[in-house]
């Protein structure tokens, strides 16, 4: 059954409209321990074999002692959000269903996933559950509420013992959102989930594309641009694998204020690798 998100997230919408991301961070942490998901690549290839001694973490400019790093040891919660506006053909819908099925096949038994659909309305098509998962794409809509859907994809309670990842697919042409991209960027700063935006095919105006890039970057994700839906399965699988094989770097903030916004930068000491990591986190007063 498809459940309209507006029906059970009204409080969240009111909070967002009031600018509430400042009031509560959903960043994943236990007591004083901060966890940063860090993707390390050499070219397009993930880099393995790194230890805590290879990483340099700066919290508000202060170098932090790294407690430990790990990979692939924590179950995933994956949100797949799909633009089903009228620009999608029947063939496109079949390709999207196939991409969701391939993601389902790649999940481990301990992982979970949900599927959200959006046009002018944002709906939860498949509730968060263990694999296998599937989705019915028999209905499409006219408008496209890209930023509304992105906001709802980002809103989820922090899970210390699980990693959260959003795969967000759209053509990027927003026609009917109630909220704008600036609120999506601010929400991303405080959200727990890393977010990869897949533009297929990209119709995003430059301003919208820039906002989507900012949302992804704030969370340690990326934007992938495809020419057609036939490339979607591989893009989904690659993005999911990149996230799964990223490092969880843990540290206890030292020498910085406990509350407020914390800028975080991550480097690998030994080599100039390409690194994606969230840009910071917030601790309520």
PLM features: residue spans?
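Positively charged n-region of N-terminal signal peptides that target proteins for export
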Residues: 1-4
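Bacterial N-terminal signal peptides
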Residues: 7-17
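Scaffold/interface architecture of coatomer-like assemblies
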Residues: 21-285
């Amino acid at each position: 059954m498809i459940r309209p998100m507006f029906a059970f997230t009204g409080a969240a919408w009111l909070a967002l409209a009031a600018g509430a991301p400042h009031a509560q961070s959903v960043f994943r942490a236990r007591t004083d321990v901060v966890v940063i998901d860090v993707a390390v690549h050499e070219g397009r290839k993930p880099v393995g074999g790194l230890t805590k001694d290879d990483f340099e973490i700066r919290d508000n400019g202060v170098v932090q002692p790294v407690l430990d790093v790990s990979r692939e040891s924590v179950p995933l919660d994956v949100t797949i959000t799909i633009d089903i506006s009228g620009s999608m053909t029947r063939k496109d819908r079949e390709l999207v269903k196939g991409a969701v099925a391939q993601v389902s096949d790649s999940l481990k038994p301990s992982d979970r996933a949900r599927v959200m659909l959006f046009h002018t309305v944002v709906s939860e098509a498949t509730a968060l559950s263990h694999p296998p998962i599937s989705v019915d794409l028999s209905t499409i809509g006219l408008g496209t509420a890209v930023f509304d859907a992105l906001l709802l994809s980002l809103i989820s309670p922090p899970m210390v013992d699980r990693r959260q990842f959003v795969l967000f697919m759209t053509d990027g042409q927003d026609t009917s959102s109630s909220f704008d991209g600036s609120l999506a960027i601010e929400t991303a700063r405080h959200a727990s989930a890393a977010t990869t935006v897949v533009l297929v095919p990209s119709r995003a105006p430059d301003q919208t594309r820039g906002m989507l890039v900012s949302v992804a970057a704030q969370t340690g994700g990326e934007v992938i641009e495809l020419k057609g839906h036939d490339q979607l399965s591989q893009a989904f699988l690659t993005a999911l694998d990149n996230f799964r094989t990223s490092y969880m770097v843990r540290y206890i903030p030292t020498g910085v204020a406990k509350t407020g916004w914390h800028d975080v930068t991550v480097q690998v000491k030994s080599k100039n690798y390409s690194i994606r990591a969230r840009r910071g986190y917030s601790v309520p007063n």
